[in-house]
């Protein structure tokens, strides 16, 4: 467990902004840049339930590829991405380029980065990528928790280890959602009945989670962007 990723998460929990209306079953965590984490809506008991990270695991693949030199920048088109670079591939959560990168990295190397990231709960199973890179794009055999997802976003926001190196800084450029009214960096995930959006702006980090089908993804985006008082321009 990486202590740096859990800064601020063990403070006093509180429910904030009770006037907001959110779908039943949605949990939102929010951490001001210099403050403590709040449960905006949902149940604190959900914090440590093991769940599939879905496409939020693509940030680990991206970070690994940047650190290993497989990807040099966020705009150069990736193999399998139909002309899109790393940033747009992350935002659109396109599977093929990340499956290809995962295969080039290999399960052992990618597993090491997964551990370093602090995102994954427990040990990385042996042979976890036996089905190939496509499995890695969703990390179906790995588990995370709401606490870990949010810890990662807080560490991004605060620029702490392990995201403070050159590759981690490039990843922050890749996480930018272009064309929005406020500058936000985030990643979505929707797979195996788990819907995620985790990231940060200049003032706070936010993680939104809900169980449900992919068709409810717009609700996740609406809740995430709504924490900054804006609506997402993309569905």
Where are these regions (language model features)?
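Short, well-structured active-site flanking segments
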Residues: 66-83, 163-168
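Mid-domain, small-residue-enriched loop/turn segments at the edges of structured enzyme/sensor domains
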Residues: 86, 100-153
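Beta-lactamase-like hydrolase cores
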Residues: 15-52, 224-231
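Short glycine/serine- and small hydrophobic-enriched flexible loop segments
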Residues: 63-71, 100-103, 151-158
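Structured C-terminal helix/loop/strand segments within mature extracytoplasmic catalytic/sensor domains
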Residues: 21, 46, 50, 103-109, ...
């Amino acid at each position: 467990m990486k202590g740096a990723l859990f800064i601020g998460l063990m403070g006093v929990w509180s429910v904030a902004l009770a006037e907001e209306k959110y779908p039943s079953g949605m949990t939102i965590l929010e951490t001001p840049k210099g403050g403590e984490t709040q449960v905006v809506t949902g149940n604190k008991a959900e914090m440590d339930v093991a769940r599939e990270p879905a496409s939020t695991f693509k940030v680990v693949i991206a970070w690994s590829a940047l650190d290993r030199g497989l990807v040099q920048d966020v705009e150069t088109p990736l193999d399998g991405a139909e002309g899109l670079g790393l940033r747009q591939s992350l935002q659109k959560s396109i599977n093929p380029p990340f499956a290809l990168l995962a295969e080039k990295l290999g399960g052992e190397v990618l597993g090491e980065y997964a551990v370093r990231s602090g995102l994954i709960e427990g040990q990385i199973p042996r042979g976890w990528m036996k089905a190939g890179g496509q499995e890695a794009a969703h990390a179906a055999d790995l588990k995370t928790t709401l606490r870990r997802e949010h810890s990662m976003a807080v560490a991004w926001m605060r620029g702490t280890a392990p995201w403070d190196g050159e590759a981690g800084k490039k990843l922050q450029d890749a996480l930018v959602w272009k064309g929005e009214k406020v500058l936000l960096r985030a990643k979505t995930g929707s797979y195996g009945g788990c819907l995620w959006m985790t990231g940060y702006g200049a003032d706070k980090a936010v993680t939104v989670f809900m169980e449900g089908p992919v068709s409810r993804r717009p609700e996740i985006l609406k809740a995430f962007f709504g924490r900054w008082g804006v609506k997402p321009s993309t569905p």
